[in-house]
Amino acid sequence: MGSRLPRDGGKQGHGAFLDGQLLVAMPGMSDNRFSRSVIYLCAHSEEGAMGIILNRPARKVTFSELLVQLDVIKADEMIRLPAQAELVQVLKGGPVETGRGFVLHSNDFFIDDSTLPIDAGVSLTATIDILRAIAKGDGPDRAILALGYAGWSAGQLEAEMQDNGWLNIPADPSLIFDEALGSKYERALQKIGIDPGRLSSDLGHA
């Protein structure tokens, strides 16, 4: 998967693009990095696509530890973080730019020239300012932090979908922010009436 980010957020020709939807990996997914993955598609255009994997935890670091590593707070301030910050999950967002952080969050938070509203319930901010806001209790009501992202070059995602690598379904903020990581895959499929146990790699798109 490539590292090129679409510049326009996928807003050209709305009908052809899937930004704001979920991609669910099909059983025949040949790339183990994306097996049983659920991806929120942040941008999709003629130039390519960019998304965040929603169900892969970053096991070696917590949000509070990351704040210390980035000098947002001092180590002795971890115990005084607001409850909002303690709820932020840290995910492995994908194999591209794994040292870079991306915050998916509710639309009640916005930073000029930094926040990209994606749909009615989700925005993306990738600057340290949002981490500072969360640490102070001034951040969005709901948020997840992803390290890295999944990227596709021009036409690559479309080709993978034609090969039944992915199923696309409508996104739901409750699934993105609230659902337990271990159940997101099954929950995403159940939302469109698919029994995960009977899912075939020959199934077409939603």
Curated annotation (Swiss-Prot):
InterPro entries associated with the record: AlgH-like
GO cellular component term of the entry, any: cytosol
SUPFAM superfamilies: VC0467-like
Any single Pfam family the record assigns to this protein: DUF179
Membrane-traversing stretches: none
Source organism, top-level taxon: Bacteria
Stated family: Belongs to the UPF0301 (AlgH) family.
Family annotation (NCBIfam families): PRK00228.1-4
This protein's name: UPF0301 protein Msil_1255
